[in-house]
């Protein structure tokens, strides 16, 4: 059974934006419960929703954290220009 942790954590993101405005997240970092900075290198983007008529772009990505493959749900807010992590799945 997969465990899912719902969170709302601001993240620092390194992403690439092409000339058409398509965003590709590459690496992000955040503070864990112990206030340690955790850096995550994104291995694969599983799904994306970048509808420019909405408030932001949603990404589901897979990456390794603490030696285990995890799924992360990330959101970029077009108006606030900020990235947030909303879910971590195991």
Regions found by a protein language model. Give the residues of each.
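Cysteine-centric segments in proteins
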Residues: 1-90
């Amino acid at each position: 059974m997969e465990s899912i942790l719902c969170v709302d954590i601001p993240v620092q993101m390194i992403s690439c934006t092409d000339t058409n405005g398509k965003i590709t997240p590459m690496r992000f970092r955040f503070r864990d419960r112990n206030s340690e900075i955790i850096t995550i290198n994104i291995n694969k983007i599983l799904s994306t929703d970048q509808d420019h008529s909405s408030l932001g772009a949603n990404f589901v990505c897979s990456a390794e954290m603490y030696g285990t493959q995890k799924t992360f749900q990330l959101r970029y807010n077009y108006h606030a220009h900020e990235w947030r992590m909303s879910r971590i799945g195991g």
